[in-house]
Amino acid sequence: MKEIANKYKKPFLGGLLIGLSVVVAVLILGDLKGVVRVFAGFNLRYLPVILLLAPLNYVFRYIKWSYYLKLSNLFPEPKMNILIFTSGLSMTVTPGKVGELLKCYLLKEHINAPFSVTSSIVMAERLTDGIAMAILASLGTLAYGYGGYVLPATFGVLGAVIILLQYDRPFRSLERLVGKRKFWRKCTAFLLEFQGSARRLFTLPALLFAVVIGVLSWGFEGAVIFLAVKAFGGEISLLGSVFVVSFSSILGALSFLPGGLGVAEGSILALLLWAGLGREMAAATTLVTRFSTLWLGVVIGLVGLYLVQKELFKVES
Protein backbone atom coordinates (compact mmCIF):
# COMPACT_ATOMS: atom_id res chain seq x y z
CA MET A 1 0.00 0.00 0.00
CA LYS A 2 2.93 2.32 0.57
CA GLU A 3 3.71 1.97 -3.14
CA ILE A 4 0.25 3.31 -4.00
CA ALA A 5 0.45 6.11 -1.44
CA ASN A 6 3.85 7.28 -2.66
CA LYS A 7 2.77 7.19 -6.31
CA TYR A 8 -0.33 9.33 -5.84
CA LYS A 9 0.64 11.41 -2.80
CA LYS A 10 2.10 14.39 -4.67
CA PRO A 11 -0.71 14.81 -7.24
CA PHE A 12 -3.32 14.36 -4.49
CA LEU A 13 -1.72 16.92 -2.18
CA GLY A 14 -1.25 19.24 -5.14
CA GLY A 15 -4.95 18.98 -5.92
CA LEU A 16 -5.81 19.61 -2.27
CA LEU A 17 -3.70 22.78 -2.15
CA ILE A 18 -5.21 24.05 -5.40
CA GLY A 19 -8.67 23.29 -3.98
CA LEU A 20 -8.01 25.36 -0.85
CA SER A 21 -6.70 28.21 -2.99
CA VAL A 22 -9.83 28.09 -5.14
CA VAL A 23 -12.08 28.24 -2.05
CA VAL A 24 -10.24 31.35 -0.87
CA ALA A 25 -10.53 32.91 -4.34
CA VAL A 26 -14.29 32.22 -4.51
CA LEU A 27 -14.77 33.74 -1.04
CA ILE A 28 -12.85 36.85 -2.09
CA LEU A 29 -14.75 37.20 -5.38
CA GLY A 30 -18.06 36.74 -3.60
CA ASP A 31 -17.16 39.16 -0.76
CA LEU A 32 -16.41 37.17 2.38
CA LYS A 33 -18.86 39.00 4.65
CA GLY A 34 -21.61 38.72 2.07
CA VAL A 35 -21.00 34.99 1.55
CA VAL A 36 -21.08 34.39 5.32
CA ARG A 37 -24.36 36.31 5.50
CA VAL A 38 -25.84 34.16 2.71
CA PHE A 39 -24.70 30.97 4.46
CA ALA A 40 -26.37 32.18 7.67
CA GLY A 41 -29.69 32.16 5.82
CA PHE A 42 -29.24 28.62 4.43
CA ASN A 43 -32.38 26.51 4.85
CA LEU A 44 -31.10 23.35 6.53
CA ARG A 45 -34.12 21.34 5.40
CA TYR A 46 -32.46 21.05 1.98
CA LEU A 47 -29.12 19.83 3.32
CA PRO A 48 -29.86 16.08 3.66
CA VAL A 49 -31.18 15.91 0.09
CA ILE A 50 -28.20 17.87 -1.27
CA LEU A 51 -25.76 15.53 0.49
CA LEU A 52 -27.68 12.49 -0.80
CA LEU A 53 -27.73 13.51 -4.47
CA ALA A 54 -23.97 13.28 -5.09
CA PRO A 55 -23.71 9.73 -3.65
CA LEU A 56 -26.64 8.79 -5.94
CA ASN A 57 -24.41 9.87 -8.81
CA TYR A 58 -21.74 7.48 -7.53
CA VAL A 59 -24.29 4.64 -7.28
CA PHE A 60 -25.18 5.01 -10.95
CA ARG A 61 -21.52 5.29 -11.92
CA TYR A 62 -20.85 2.09 -9.96
CA ILE A 63 -23.59 0.36 -11.98
CA LYS A 64 -21.79 1.40 -15.17
CA TRP A 65 -18.41 0.30 -13.77
CA SER A 66 -19.81 -3.14 -12.88
CA TYR A 67 -21.46 -3.43 -16.30
CA TYR A 68 -18.13 -2.74 -18.01
CA LEU A 69 -16.38 -5.31 -15.83
CA LYS A 70 -18.96 -7.91 -16.85
CA LEU A 71 -18.51 -7.06 -20.54
CA SER A 72 -14.76 -7.52 -20.04
CA ASN A 73 -15.23 -10.92 -18.32
CA LEU A 74 -13.82 -9.62 -15.04
CA PHE A 75 -15.60 -10.74 -11.90
CA PRO A 76 -14.13 -9.31 -8.68
CA GLU A 77 -15.64 -10.28 -5.34
CA PRO A 78 -18.66 -7.95 -4.80
CA LYS A 79 -17.41 -6.33 -1.60
CA MET A 80 -13.96 -5.71 -3.08
CA ASN A 81 -15.52 -4.35 -6.25
CA ILE A 82 -17.38 -1.70 -4.25
CA LEU A 83 -14.24 -0.76 -2.32
CA ILE A 84 -12.08 -0.62 -5.46
CA PHE A 85 -14.60 1.60 -7.25
CA THR A 86 -14.97 3.82 -4.19
CA SER A 87 -11.18 4.15 -3.87
CA GLY A 88 -11.06 5.69 -7.32
CA LEU A 89 -13.14 8.62 -6.08
CA SER A 90 -10.22 9.71 -3.92
CA MET A 91 -8.25 10.39 -7.10
CA THR A 92 -10.71 12.74 -8.82
CA VAL A 93 -8.47 15.67 -7.83
CA THR A 94 -5.55 14.34 -9.90
CA PRO A 95 -4.92 15.94 -13.34
CA GLY A 96 -7.44 14.65 -15.89
CA LYS A 97 -8.60 12.13 -13.24
CA VAL A 98 -5.71 9.91 -14.33
CA GLY A 99 -5.37 8.89 -10.69
CA GLU A 100 -8.50 6.80 -11.20
CA LEU A 101 -6.15 4.31 -12.87
CA LEU A 102 -5.59 3.33 -9.25
CA LYS A 103 -8.62 1.08 -9.78
CA CYS A 104 -6.63 -0.81 -12.43
CA TYR A 105 -3.78 -1.41 -10.00
CA LEU A 106 -6.18 -2.64 -7.32
CA LEU A 107 -7.94 -5.01 -9.73
CA LYS A 108 -4.53 -6.34 -10.76
CA GLU A 109 -3.76 -7.07 -7.11
CA HIS A 110 -7.19 -8.57 -6.46
CA ILE A 111 -7.85 -10.79 -9.52
CA ASN A 112 -4.74 -10.28 -11.67
CA ALA A 113 -6.79 -8.32 -14.22
CA PRO A 114 -4.76 -7.14 -17.25
CA PHE A 115 -4.00 -3.43 -17.12
CA SER A 116 -4.74 -3.13 -20.85
CA VAL A 117 -8.31 -4.25 -20.16
CA THR A 118 -9.00 -2.32 -16.96
CA SER A 119 -7.49 0.92 -18.27
CA SER A 120 -9.86 0.73 -21.26
CA ILE A 121 -12.74 0.54 -18.77
CA VAL A 122 -11.56 3.70 -16.98
CA MET A 123 -11.21 5.41 -20.37
CA ALA A 124 -14.73 4.30 -21.38
CA GLU A 125 -16.11 5.67 -18.11
CA ARG A 126 -14.59 9.07 -18.82
CA LEU A 127 -15.67 9.18 -22.48
CA THR A 128 -19.28 8.20 -21.80
CA ASP A 129 -19.41 10.67 -18.89
CA GLY A 130 -18.21 13.32 -21.33
CA ILE A 131 -20.93 12.42 -23.84
CA ALA A 132 -23.59 12.48 -21.10
CA MET A 133 -22.44 15.90 -19.87
CA ALA A 134 -22.37 17.24 -23.43
CA ILE A 135 -25.96 16.02 -23.98
CA LEU A 136 -27.12 17.70 -20.77
CA ALA A 137 -25.25 20.88 -21.61
CA SER A 138 -26.76 20.85 -25.11
CA LEU A 139 -30.25 21.04 -23.61
CA GLY A 140 -29.17 24.20 -21.81
CA THR A 141 -27.54 25.55 -24.93
CA LEU A 142 -30.79 25.16 -26.86
CA ALA A 143 -32.61 27.02 -24.10
CA TYR A 144 -30.05 29.74 -23.38
CA GLY A 145 -27.94 29.97 -26.54
CA TYR A 146 -24.66 29.69 -24.60
CA GLY A 147 -21.68 27.42 -25.27
CA GLY A 148 -22.41 26.81 -28.95
CA TYR A 149 -18.74 26.41 -29.88
CA VAL A 150 -17.51 24.21 -27.05
CA LEU A 151 -20.16 21.49 -27.27
CA PRO A 152 -19.84 20.57 -30.98
CA ALA A 153 -16.08 20.37 -30.50
CA THR A 154 -16.58 18.12 -27.47
CA PHE A 155 -18.94 15.80 -29.37
CA GLY A 156 -16.52 15.76 -32.30
CA VAL A 157 -13.47 14.79 -30.25
CA LEU A 158 -15.30 12.12 -28.22
CA GLY A 159 -16.94 10.70 -31.34
CA ALA A 160 -13.61 10.56 -33.20
CA VAL A 161 -11.97 8.63 -30.34
CA ILE A 162 -14.82 6.11 -30.20
CA ILE A 163 -14.74 5.59 -33.99
CA LEU A 164 -10.95 5.14 -33.94
CA LEU A 165 -11.25 2.45 -31.29
CA GLN A 166 -13.61 0.42 -33.50
CA TYR A 167 -10.78 -0.45 -35.90
CA ASP A 168 -7.55 -2.29 -35.19
CA ARG A 169 -5.96 -1.46 -38.57
CA PRO A 170 -4.19 1.73 -37.35
CA PHE A 171 -2.78 -0.18 -34.38
CA ARG A 172 -1.64 -3.10 -36.53
CA SER A 173 0.01 -0.67 -38.93
CA LEU A 174 1.85 0.79 -35.97
CA GLU A 175 2.90 -2.72 -34.94
CA ARG A 176 4.40 -3.36 -38.38
CA LEU A 177 6.07 0.05 -38.35
CA VAL A 178 8.03 -0.55 -35.14
CA GLY A 179 9.32 -3.90 -36.42
CA LYS A 180 11.15 -6.10 -33.93
CA ARG A 181 12.24 -3.42 -31.47
CA LYS A 182 11.33 -5.01 -28.16
CA PHE A 183 10.16 -1.97 -26.19
CA TRP A 184 7.94 -0.61 -28.96
CA ARG A 185 6.52 -4.05 -29.72
CA LYS A 186 5.43 -4.28 -26.08
CA CYS A 187 3.78 -0.88 -26.39
CA THR A 188 1.91 -1.80 -29.56
CA ALA A 189 0.86 -5.15 -28.08
CA PHE A 190 -0.59 -3.27 -25.12
CA LEU A 191 -2.41 -0.86 -27.46
CA LEU A 192 -3.90 -3.74 -29.47
CA GLU A 193 -5.20 -5.39 -26.29
CA PHE A 194 -6.50 -2.00 -25.12
CA GLN A 195 -8.28 -1.40 -28.44
CA GLY A 196 -9.80 -4.89 -28.46
CA SER A 197 -11.16 -4.39 -24.97
CA ALA A 198 -12.42 -0.87 -25.73
CA ARG A 199 -14.25 -2.08 -28.84
CA ARG A 200 -16.36 -4.40 -26.69
CA LEU A 201 -17.29 -1.46 -24.47
CA PHE A 202 -18.38 0.74 -27.38
CA THR A 203 -20.87 -1.50 -29.14
CA LEU A 204 -24.11 0.41 -29.72
CA PRO A 205 -26.08 -1.26 -26.87
CA ALA A 206 -23.20 -0.76 -24.40
CA LEU A 207 -22.70 2.84 -25.48
CA LEU A 208 -26.40 3.67 -25.16
CA PHE A 209 -26.62 2.04 -21.73
CA ALA A 210 -23.55 3.88 -20.44
CA VAL A 211 -24.66 7.26 -21.79
CA VAL A 212 -28.17 6.91 -20.31
CA ILE A 213 -26.61 6.02 -16.95
CA GLY A 214 -24.32 9.04 -17.32
CA VAL A 215 -27.20 11.40 -18.09
CA LEU A 216 -29.06 10.19 -15.00
CA SER A 217 -26.03 10.37 -12.70
CA TRP A 218 -24.90 13.83 -13.83
CA GLY A 219 -28.51 15.02 -13.70
CA PHE A 220 -28.38 14.45 -9.95
CA GLU A 221 -25.45 16.86 -9.74
CA GLY A 222 -27.49 19.46 -11.61
CA ALA A 223 -30.19 19.04 -8.99
CA VAL A 224 -27.59 19.91 -6.33
CA ILE A 225 -27.26 23.44 -7.74
CA PHE A 226 -31.04 23.76 -8.07
CA LEU A 227 -31.61 22.83 -4.42
CA ALA A 228 -28.64 24.84 -3.13
CA VAL A 229 -30.00 28.00 -4.75
CA LYS A 230 -33.42 27.22 -3.27
CA ALA A 231 -31.85 26.73 0.16
CA PHE A 232 -30.22 30.15 -0.07
CA GLY A 233 -33.55 31.74 -1.00
CA GLY A 234 -32.82 32.23 -4.70
CA GLU A 235 -34.43 31.00 -7.90
CA ILE A 236 -33.02 29.10 -10.88
CA SER A 237 -34.65 26.63 -13.26
CA LEU A 238 -33.77 22.94 -13.08
CA LEU A 239 -32.71 23.05 -16.73
CA GLY A 240 -30.46 26.01 -15.96
CA SER A 241 -28.92 24.14 -13.02
CA VAL A 242 -28.19 21.07 -15.13
CA PHE A 243 -26.63 23.27 -17.81
CA VAL A 244 -24.40 25.04 -15.27
CA VAL A 245 -22.99 21.84 -13.74
CA SER A 246 -22.56 19.95 -17.03
CA PHE A 247 -21.01 22.81 -19.00
CA SER A 248 -18.64 23.75 -16.17
CA SER A 249 -17.66 20.08 -15.77
CA ILE A 250 -16.81 19.87 -19.47
CA LEU A 251 -14.62 22.97 -19.22
CA GLY A 252 -12.98 21.57 -16.07
CA ALA A 253 -12.26 18.25 -17.80
CA LEU A 254 -10.84 19.97 -20.89
CA SER A 255 -8.50 22.00 -18.68
CA PHE A 256 -6.83 18.76 -17.43
CA LEU A 257 -6.31 20.51 -14.10
CA PRO A 258 -6.72 18.38 -10.95
CA GLY A 259 -10.48 17.89 -10.60
CA GLY A 260 -10.97 20.82 -12.98
CA LEU A 261 -10.15 22.97 -9.97
CA GLY A 262 -10.40 26.67 -10.62
CA VAL A 263 -11.91 26.26 -14.07
CA ALA A 264 -15.03 24.42 -12.86
CA GLU A 265 -15.58 26.80 -9.92
CA GLY A 266 -14.99 29.84 -12.08
CA SER A 267 -17.43 28.53 -14.70
CA ILE A 268 -20.12 27.72 -12.12
CA LEU A 269 -19.73 31.16 -10.55
CA ALA A 270 -19.83 32.97 -13.90
CA LEU A 271 -22.83 31.01 -15.18
CA LEU A 272 -24.77 31.58 -11.96
CA LEU A 273 -24.08 35.32 -12.22
CA TRP A 274 -25.18 35.15 -15.86
CA ALA A 275 -28.38 33.38 -14.69
CA GLY A 276 -29.18 36.39 -12.50
CA LEU A 277 -27.95 35.38 -9.04
CA GLY A 278 -26.24 37.92 -6.82
CA ARG A 279 -22.48 37.70 -6.37
CA GLU A 280 -22.66 36.48 -2.77
CA MET A 281 -25.30 33.82 -3.47
CA ALA A 282 -23.48 32.64 -6.60
CA ALA A 283 -20.25 32.22 -4.61
CA ALA A 284 -22.01 30.38 -1.77
CA THR A 285 -23.80 28.07 -4.24
CA THR A 286 -20.50 27.34 -5.98
CA LEU A 287 -18.90 26.27 -2.70
CA VAL A 288 -21.84 24.05 -1.69
CA THR A 289 -21.96 22.47 -5.15
CA ARG A 290 -18.26 21.65 -5.28
CA PHE A 291 -18.25 20.29 -1.75
CA SER A 292 -21.18 18.02 -2.50
CA THR A 293 -20.12 16.92 -6.00
CA LEU A 294 -16.31 16.79 -5.61
CA TRP A 295 -14.92 16.91 -2.08
CA LEU A 296 -17.55 14.65 -0.52
CA GLY A 297 -16.58 12.05 -3.12
CA VAL A 298 -12.89 12.48 -2.29
CA VAL A 299 -13.63 11.86 1.41
CA ILE A 300 -15.71 8.77 0.56
CA GLY A 301 -12.87 7.62 -1.69
CA LEU A 302 -10.27 7.98 1.05
CA VAL A 303 -12.41 5.81 3.33
CA GLY A 304 -12.65 3.24 0.53
CA LEU A 305 -8.89 3.37 -0.01
CA TYR A 306 -8.27 2.74 3.69
CA LEU A 307 -10.63 -0.26 3.66
CA VAL A 308 -8.98 -1.63 0.51
CA GLN A 309 -5.66 -1.43 2.30
CA LYS A 310 -7.06 -3.55 5.11
CA GLU A 311 -8.56 -6.12 2.73
CA LEU A 312 -5.90 -6.41 0.03
CA PHE A 313 -2.73 -5.86 1.97
CA LYS A 314 -3.25 -7.70 5.25
CA VAL A 315 0.07 -9.46 4.83
CA GLU A 316 1.93 -6.19 4.34
CA SER A 317 0.17 -4.61 7.31
Give the residues covered by each predicted segment.
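Predominantly cytoplasmic-facing regulatory/coupling regions of multi-pass membrane proteins
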Residues: 1-86, 143-253, 286, 291-317
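Interfacial segments of multi-pass membrane proteins
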Residues: 107-115, 244, 248, 266-284
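Membrane-interface alpha-helices at helix entry/exit sites of multi-pass transporters
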Residues: 78-81, 101, 113-124, 278-288
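Extended non-transmembrane interhelical loops and adjacent amphipathic helices
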Residues: 82-112
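Membrane-embedded alpha-helical segments of transport systems
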Residues: 90-95, 119-141, 287-299
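Transmembrane alpha-helix interface/packing and boundary motifs in multi-pass membrane proteins
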Residues: 87-96, 245-265
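Membrane-embedded alpha-helical core segments of multi-pass
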Residues: 61, 99, 131-139, 155-157
